[in-house]
Structure formats: structure tokens, C-alpha cells
Amino acid sequence: MQHETHTHGINMSALGRDKQSLNLERETVAIEVPGLSLFYGEKQALYDVSMNIPKQRVTAFIGPSGCGKSTLLRTFNRMNDLVDGCRVEGAINLYGNNIYRKGEDVAELRRRVGMVFQKPNPFPKTIYENVVYGLRIQGINKKRILDEAVEWALKGAALWDEVKDRLHDSALGLSGGQQQRLVIARTIAVEPEVLLLDEPCSALDPISTLKVEELIYELKSKFTIVIVTHNMQQAARVSDYTAFMYMGKLVEFGDTDTLFTNPAKKQTEDYITGRYG
């Protein structure tokens, strides 16, 4: 399909990202998916999905409810292992190593591939203890190291200036948007390589959403980010690459501007112009 697509009012203005030189073929690959299928019991949820997630870019997964985008996201740190009857066929390579190989240290994998969920889930602890939680699990207890990690992670999550004078107050006293940025700080404190964001703004107001979107843009200089979103405006704003999924299959994957303005598949065009989904 060669003609330009009407984008149904989608604002394509990115958050200041440099879009000139995006080329999926030239990117360094962080996560390689060479043909992945997933089953819940007898029900197949993913069908032979193949894609390469580029390093230190933001990749968005879009598609209607139930299309498999969150299921695919959760395969990247094996969260689906926690679902009874879940079975994966194929491989996922994180920097060349199959994370589904026998003997894989799943706890270490989840440190390397951190995840933030839809609803902010701070622990009922102080702001400080939320941030250092993962470090303490690793046996790190030196105050100087923890203090430095708290400041680094909270600055990285654009929250330091708002909470630096109340680090020992309960995290539950923060606003929803602050709680979500705290959860991001807690996730990056253990210095993962990949950040998975499963609709991180769906429970937030517009101002908090904008702060998280700006944060995502800042974080990609250090982390590979994959975000699932129902909000196509958000995908257009924050991502470098977008994957459109439908009924468990990957329909189209490419740079975000091209996918939204000149999609290769009619199914993609129908979705982004609001004909279904």
C-alpha cells in the first residue's frame, strides 16, 4: 500500500526524539524473537511471532484488547511462568542468550528485565525502602551505597526534587503519578538492561501521564524500553518503533512514524483509523 494514510487525529509530534536515522535493519538487537508461540492449556495466545527489539530505543505494542500484546511483553521476563498451564514454543534471545533455556536463573532474568504494571504498586514502606528493596534482596546494605542508589534512581525517575525531604514518609502518601514514578525508580535502582511497561499510564491523569511519557524519553538513553499501550496517541508520541498485533499475531512492525502515516498492511490502517478495535 503506497498511499498516505489519514491518521484519525493522531498527533505524531514526538517528545523531542531524533527521528532522522531510524532504520530497524541497522539497530543493535536487545531482544530477538525468532518465532514464538504461546499456549494457555489448549488455547493458543501467540502465533509464531518473530521480531527484533532494538537496544536503547522505545518500542510500543499496540492492538485491540486481547490481541496478545501484554502476553508477548510478559514473555520477555517470563512472567507468564506464573500462569498455570502456560507453555511456550520457540526462543527469546536476550543479547544472544535464550532466556527459555534449561537452567535459566529466572530471578536474575527479572533483575535484568524489569517490569512496571498498569496500576502503581508501591510497597507499604517508606519511599526510601521502596527504592532500595531490590538492592537489599541482593544483599546490599551499606548505607552509603543505598543512599547513592536512592538519589540516582529517584533523579532518574524525575521524582527526587518532589520527595528528597520526605524519603522516610510512607510511599502510600504519594499521588498516583508520583507512585508510578516511584515504582519506576524502584525498578531502575537494580540497573536492569530492559524496562517493560504494561500500560503504565492507564490509571493516571493527563498531567501525570505527560510526566511519565517525558520520563520514558529520558530513560531510553540508558535502557531498552518496551511499552504496551491502548493509547495510540501515546504510542505515536513516545516510541521509536511500533508493533501492531491482532488475534495473537504480529501484523506489522516498523518505525513509528511510517507505521502510523503509511502502514504496509490494510489491517494496520483499519486499526489506526478507527475502523475496528
From Swiss-Prot:
GO MF: ATP binding; ATP hydrolysis activity; ATPase-coupled phosphate ion transmembrane transporter activity
The UniProt record lists the keyword Kinase: no
Reaction catalyzed: phosphate(out) + ATP + H2O = ADP + 2 phosphate(in) + H(+)
Gene Ontology CC: one annotated term: plasma membrane
Signal peptide limits: none
Binding residues for ATP: 63-70
Membrane topology: Peripheral membrane protein
Pfam family, one: ABC_tran
Keywords, ordered alphabetically: ATP-binding, Cell inner membrane, Cell membrane, Membrane, Nucleotide-binding, Phosphate transport, Translocase, Transport
The EC number(s) this enzyme carries: 7.3.2.1
UniProt keyword annotation of Cell division present: no
Class of this enzyme: translocase
Annotated ABC transporter domain residues: 31-272
GO term, biological process aspect, one: phosphate ion transmembrane transport
Cell location: Cell inner membrane
Lineage: superkingdom: Bacteria
NCBIfam families: 3a0107s01c2 (TIGR00972)
Function: Part of the ABC transporter complex PstSACB involved in phosphate import. Responsible for energy coupling to the transport system.
Family: Belongs to the ABC transporter superfamily. Phosphate importer (TC 3.A.1.7) family.
Subunit text: The complex is composed of two ATP-binding proteins (PstB), two transmembrane proteins (PstC and PstA) and a solute-binding protein (PstS).
Protein name in UniProt: Phosphate import ATP-binding protein PstB
Highest classification ranks of the organism: Bacteria, Pseudomonadati, Pseudomonadota, Gammaproteobacteria, Pseudomonadales
Gene it is expressed from: pstB
